[in-house]
Design a protein with these regions (language model features):
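Glycine-rich phosphate/pyrophosphate-handling loop used in enzymes and phosphotransfer proteins
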Residues: 1-183, 187-217
Length: 217
């Protein structure tokens, strides 16, 4: 470690992204690494309409949830590096990732992008793209601002809430391609399924999905 790096560590100490504990190496402390709610076995993969498989490395609870809320709403964009690493490893271990042609993400509306300043799912997609060596492109667009899915009360409401919200980018070409769709959290899968439906209708041969975390059934 250089003198400059040592000074940086003193002024801006490295902290665990989940609990905030000051650590010397990595981005996660040993305690969190051991106790995080990892998905295992059949819990990793979900079957969703229009999606060949949706994989998630973590359950959305406790420290995982709190870290995600900081990432999404408190401008902790650097968290995308650690979250993206979890997601890329999950893809490597559970999907035929070498057959994936392009990575894309669930888009934000222009209104929400202006308010937040970044699309948390696209930052994750870019990180996964870099780790897997697969190109990342904006394939979809959000045509209108709908109610946040977290504010809906049922699976039926979630399906209705995303109907007609997304469409393909004008120059996007997915004909006979396999797409990896990136989102942050999956609950019922309504948003991912609707985006996958649009991609399949545009000619995509297969759509896989990966999220940072999932809710327990």
């Amino acid at each position: 470690m250089s003198v400059f790096d040592s000074i940086l560590d003193l002024v801006f100490p490295r902290k665990c992204v989940f609990c905030g504990k000051v650590i010397k190496k990595s981005d996660i402390c040993n305690e969190c690494r051991a106790k995080l709610p990892y998905t295992k076995g059949d819990e990793i993969t979900q079957k969703l309409p229009f999606v060949s498989a949706c994989v998630s490395p973590l359950f959305y609870e406790n420290e995982v949830r709190e870290a995600f809320l900081r990432y999404k709403f408190s401008n902790e964009q650097a968290y995308a590096v650690k979250f993206g690493k979890f997601m890329a490893e999950c893809v490597k271990n559970n999907l035929d990732y070498e057959g994936i042609d392009v990575i894309s993400c669930v888009p934000l509306s222009k209104k929400r992008f202006r308010k937040r300043g970044y699309n948390q799912s696209r930052l994750l997609a870019k990180e996964i793209s870099e780790r897997l060596g697969i190109p990342e492109k904006e394939l979809l667009k959000k045509n209108k601002d709908n109610l946040a899915q977290s504010k809906t009360k049922s699976s039926k409401e979630r399906l209705i809430n995303v109907a007609g919200v997304y469409s393909m980018q004008r120059a996007a070409d997915v004909n006979r391609k396999t797409v990896l769709l990136v989102d942050d959290i999956v609950t019922t899968g309504a948003t991912i399924s609707e985006c996958a439906r649009i991609l399949r209708r545009a000619g995509a041969e297969r759509v896989f999905a990966v999220t940072y975390a999932r809710h327990r059934d």
